[in-house]
């Protein structure tokens, strides 16, 4: 209830939920009926295989970290239709102020928000610093077997800055810049980009 009151005080009009149907069923959103809920659930490619390896006890901490770096690269490049959807929903009526979230709040949400912040002109170092805060705001997510290596689980559930840096490096390597990525891959026009900046930047 305190969280709902906080959302009301912030004037939140929309919630963007990147969780799949089973994830939403386990922990439904509890928001004011007047708040619009927009659902675009997806699982990052490679996640099921990674979680299976962890739960089998076959993924070492070092392998888990390497897998996460690769996952973040793929997360940036393989799910562009979802990022384009977020941008355009934000520009729609009552699209903002908004909250965007997933299950743990650092992977799908982290990359989505980072790309959005870079699109509206926030400096890369500030974006990485913002992401790092997620590491200290995490809540336990019960999705691992009891015999999974705890150190490997910690690597997967951590919000290490180099994870997000890997995603941004992949975008820059593939497209030259985030601006080119947004234009060529997400199809955002300069007018839409300016509108997003006006909407989100004070």
Language model regions located:
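Ser/Thr-glycine-rich phosphate-binding loops at phosphate-binding pockets of nucleotides
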Residues: 104, 108-109
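Cys-dependent protein tyrosine phosphatase-like superfamily
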Residues: 1-99, 111-202
């Amino acid at each position: 209830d305190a969280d709902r009151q906080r959302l009301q005080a912030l004037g939140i009009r929309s919630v963007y939920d990147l969780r799949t149907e089973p994830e939403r069923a386990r922990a439904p959103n509890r928001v004011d009926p007047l708040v619009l809920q927009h659902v675009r659930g997806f699982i990052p490619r490679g996640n099921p295989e990674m979680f299976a390896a962890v739960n089998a006890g076959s993924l070492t901490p070092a392998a888990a970290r390497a897998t996460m770096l690769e996952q973040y690269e793929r997360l940036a490049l393989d799910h562009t239709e979802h990022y384009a959807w977020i941008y355009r929903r934000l520009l729609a009526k009552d699209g903002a102020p908004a909250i965007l979230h997933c299950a743990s709040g650092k992977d799908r949400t982290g990359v989505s928000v980072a790309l959005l912040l870079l699109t509206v002109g926030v400096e890369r170092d500030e974006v990485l610093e913002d992401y790092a805060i997620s590491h200290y705001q995490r809540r336990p997510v019960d999705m691992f077997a009891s015999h999974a290596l705890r150190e490997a689980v910690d690597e997967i559930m951590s919000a290490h800055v180099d994870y997000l840096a890997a995603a941004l490096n992949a975008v820059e390597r593939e497209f030259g810049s985030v601006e080119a990525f947004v234009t060529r891959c997400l199809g955002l026009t300069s007018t839409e980009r300016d509108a997003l900046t006006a909407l989100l930047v004070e």
